[in-house]
Design a protein with these regions (language model features):
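A short, active-site helix/loop in glycosyltransferases that binds the activated sugar's phosphate group
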Residues: 2-35, 47
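Conserved catalytic-core segment of nucleotide-activated headgroup transferases in glycan assembly
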Residues: 52-115
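Short beta-strand->alpha-helix junction loop in the catalytic core
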Residues: 21-22, 37-50, 96-98
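Acidic donor-binding loop of glycosyltransferase active sites
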Residues: 123-137, 150
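Short glycine/acidic-rich beta->alpha loop that forms part of the nucleotide-sugar donor binding site
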Residues: 136-139, 146, 156
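Short acidic/histidine- and often glycine-rich active-site loop of Leloir-type glycosyltransferases
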Residues: 157-167, 171-172
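A charged, aromatic-enriched C-terminal amphipathic alpha-helix characteristic of glycosyltransferases
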Residues: 174, 190-221
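Short alpha-helical segment that forms part of, or immediately flanks, the ligand-binding pocket
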Residues: 119, 142-147, 161-162
Length: 224
């Protein structure tokens, strides 16, 4: 923007970005004076929620990011997933106009509200599924799911490949066929689910806002 050009050249800002994908895709012109990575963290409400390894949620999937982040891809894949996961339901965020096919496929609009409702919905889900999107520079929704030890299946679009350790905390699919297969695997194979969940529990609270604060101070070279 024209009004920002003079302050930009005057103050020479270094851009602070949220991850590797964000770093790689930031244009040269908007990071002319440099760029650094500062990974964010989920809120303490997610970090402080206790997760029971032995709890087996119903075989449901959840998608808690925006509908413009490849939801159509997801709903099309879910139509195929549903054929092998007959008892499963998919919970997505409103607003969205469900088609008759969506309703038949047990796609359900979540009730949006307090954060505790989101936490409850995530804890009661077997898998978090999201293709990802080129505009996702971090995807806090996926990070919140990971903090609550919900395995993730993604296509890895945008920054989503950064939120998943393939085969350890979820799966990064190479194509839609794999996306469908990996989702069905977690929904129907309790051993796979428990293995992924155990790995996630071991990584729980690996990054919180104390870490973010410390890293920011280092980036800014500030003495506490």
């Amino acid at each position: 923007r024209k009004k920002q050009l003079i302050p930009f050249f005057k103050f020479k800002p270094v851009m602070i970005l949220e991850g590797d994908y964000h770093y790689k895709t930031r244009s040269f012109l908007t990071s002319f004076y440099g760029k650094k990575v500062l990974k964010i963290a989920p809120d303490n409400d997610f970090i402080n929620t206790k997760v029971d390894l032995n709890n087996l949620p119903p075989p449901n999937a959840i998608f808690t990011t925006k509908s413009d982040r490849n939801l159509n891809f997801l709903l099309d894949a879910w139509h195929q997933i549903k054929k092998k996961s007959i008892q499963s339901k998919l919970f997505i965020n409103p607003p969205h106009s469900l088609t008759d096919i969506n309703v038949q496929d047990d796609v359900i609009l979540r009730k949006k509200g307090e954060k505790n409702l989101l936490i409850e919905d995530l804890v009661n889900s077997r898998v978090f599924i999201t293709p990802g999107h080129k505009t996702e520079v971090f995807c806090l929704a996926a990070e919140e799911a990971r903090e609550l030890c919900v395995p993730i299946v993604t296509m890895g679009f945008g920054s989503l490949y950064e939120r998943v350790e393939h085969g350890l905390t979820g799966f990064v699919a190479k194509n839609k066929k794999e996306f469908i297969e990996y989702t069905n695997l977690i929904l129907n194979d309790n051993n796979i689910y428990y293995k992924l969940k155990d790995n996630l529990i071991k990584r729980k609270n690996s990054r919180n806002y104390s870490h973010v604060k410390s890293d920011l101070i280092k980036l800014l070279n500030i003495d506490e």
